[in-house]
Amino acid sequence: MTTTRFAPSPTGHIHVGNLRTALMNYLIARKAGGTFILRLDDTDRERSKQEYADGIQRDLEWLGLTWDRIERQSDRLDRYAEAAEGLRAAGRLYEVFETPTELDLKRKKQLNMGKPPVYDRAGLKLSAEDKDRLRAEGRAGYWRFLLDQERIEWADGILGDISIDAASVSDPVLIRADGQVLYTFASSVDDAEMGVTHIVRGADHVTNTATQIQIIRALGSEPPAFAHHSLLTGAQGEELSKRLGTLSIRDLRESGVAPEALLSLMARLGSSQPVELKMSLDELAEGFDLGQFGASPTKFDAEDLWPLTREANQSRPLAEVRDRIAALGVPDELVERFWRVASQNITKLDDLAGWWQIFSTGAEPQIDPEDADFIAEAMKLLPPPPYTDATWGEFTNAVKQATGRKGKGLFMPLRKALTGQAHGPDMSEVMPLLQVVRARG
């Protein structure tokens, strides 16, 4: 069975880059009828917060990205300890003691000699006596994974065939001196034991993937199929990472972006397929194809979300917004008409409040000086509310007869006086919604 996972660290709010990863993994699982796991990588005890874990789940639920099971790495520490013991027994974990300063000096020396800055495996040469002496000096050992120095190859679902020489990569640190397991190790253990079959993540993880393939094999499992999507840039190609805090899913939700708009854009961004609004995840899954995605950096512009949001909200059935409309105070008998009229003239659902304010308390009349006398005369011909579907036609005919005006010179000033806007819904539909007309005085 196809099994994918989204594994965020609950150290902050998830952003559009995280969503792209989550969505790709979700769609792969759904298209195959498989399992989608939400795994909270919360082994960083200092930075992981429950409020962020709750926020991640809230964001995914808002988007409809429901998970089949949820896992927390903090609940699996015993499994990592057992796996580490197995690797030690197999000679694949070795203890090292270098300080960050010593490692930095080694790197600089290697670079000055024209060599790649790869860890020199000095820890392998330490005797038991050496280690005891270092501990007596107050040093705490940490643990590296011994890579087989061979080429690590895989068929990447997006990047194609990848080959990395393990000799050019430092043996990764898997366990810190305080015993905390690091991402590379915990993730490998989880992916192996949870039966993850496909992993899609950012191209900045390619080197991690090479080392994790060896770790997973050392654990006695076969690695999953990997794919690495391009990284996002800003609209002008600028680095986006510094701005991701302002592009959190929470902030986009609160700004009024429709979930369908965000999903539709992120499911196609960076692919050869055109971005089209899809109102369901089933539709997105049906057309999803990793083979359509390219390796080049992908431009993301938040402004692209607004036309899609407008389209999504305009096509939304009344049943989805009835409670929201009722909460505005719209009478039951006007709810259907109000949605029919307002839905085609909003971008965000929050815009509905502005339209109901116009209809319920009256708009501030917009009257050009040259139209003041015309409007004053016209308003004498408009009876007080309530109005019907016929009111607009009857009213404008009466004004036309009384003033001789016609066409735009007739309709535009009247619209601006009644609604405070030069453009908007069909006035014959608007009139029955008007509770107050300020222009009547």
From Swiss-Prot:
It catalyses: tRNA(Glu) + L-glutamate + ATP = L-glutamyl-tRNA(Glu) + AMP + diphosphate. Its EC number is 6.1.1.17. Its main location: cytoplasm. The keyword Lipid biosynthesis does not apply. It holds the Pfam family tRNA-synt_1c. GO terms for molecular function: ATP binding; glutamate-tRNA ligase activity; tRNA binding. One of its GO terms (cellular component) is cytoplasm. HAMAP family: Glu_tRNA_synth_type1. Belongs to the class-I aminoacyl-tRNA synthetase family. Glutamate--tRNA ligase type 1 subfamily. Monomer. This is Glutamate--tRNA ligase 1. It comes from Paracoccus denitrificans (strain Pd 1222).
